[in-house]
């Protein structure tokens, strides 16, 4: 007898800026950084879940029409990712706050899922993220290509008119 056990779906947003940086969230109590992402609730679309999770984990309120659908990616044995992307101007991260909490099994306290935020160069993903996330962000998604596609210009490009 076999049981079909579908993989859970986690939805999130890859937030880029034109300085070739990616917004990452530090996972509380862990050594790694991650994208704002999380599980899809019953009745939600992947886009709805990505917007909600980004808001809960960072406080950012993104507009649906600002997101580009990157698609679904194999992630772990139990989970797939559905990711979207957007480009934003680089902004001060001091105002970001994680509203999503979990019960810490050691202290018994409610802690934020994310306890820090940072803009990081694309090349730093492997040093900061888990190997599975590094595979997605480093091999399956071309961050440079996404940036060019969303902005219409290469990273760091300054038009002659803007330079004058």
Across the structure, where does each feature detected by a protein language model lie?
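Charged phosphate-binding loop/patch that engages nucleotide di/tri-phosphates or the phosphate backbone
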Residues: 122-164
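Active-site-adjacent beta-strand/loop module that shapes the phosphate/pyrophosphate-binding cleft
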Residues: 73-106, 118-123, 136-147
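A short coil-to-beta-strand element that immediately follows conserved catalytic motifs
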Residues: 61-71
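Conserved N-terminal beta-strand and adjoining loop/helix that marks the start
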Residues: 1-22
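Short hydrophobic/aromatic beta-strand or adjacent loop that forms the aromatic wall/cage
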Residues: 8-12, 79-83, 114
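Conserved Nudix-box catalytic region and its N-terminal flanking loop in Nudix hydrolases
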Residues: 17-60, 164
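Short, P/G- and charge-enriched loop/turn segments at secondary-structure junctions
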Residues: 1-3, 70, 103-108
């Amino acid at each position: 007898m076999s049981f079909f056990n579908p993989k859970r779906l986690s939805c999130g947003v890859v937030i880029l800026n034109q300085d070739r940086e990616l917004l990452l969230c530090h996972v509380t109590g862990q050594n790694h950084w991650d994208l704002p992402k999380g599980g899809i609730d019953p009745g939600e679309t992947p886009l709805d879940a990505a917007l909600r999770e980004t808001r809960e984990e960072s406080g950012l309120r993104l507009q649906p029409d600002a997101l580009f659908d990157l698609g679904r990616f194999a992630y772990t044995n139990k989970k797939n990712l559905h990711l979207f992307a957007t480009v934003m101007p680089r902004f001060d991260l001091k105002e970001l706050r994680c509203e999503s909490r979990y019960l810490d099994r050691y202290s018994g306290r409610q802690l934020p899922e994310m306890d820090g935020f940072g803009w990081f160069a694309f090349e730093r993903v492997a040093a900061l993220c888990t190997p599975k996330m590094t595979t997605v962000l480093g091999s399956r998604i071309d961050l440079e290509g996404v940036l060019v596609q969303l902005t219409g210009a290469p990273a760091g490009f300054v038009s002659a008119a803007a330079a004058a």
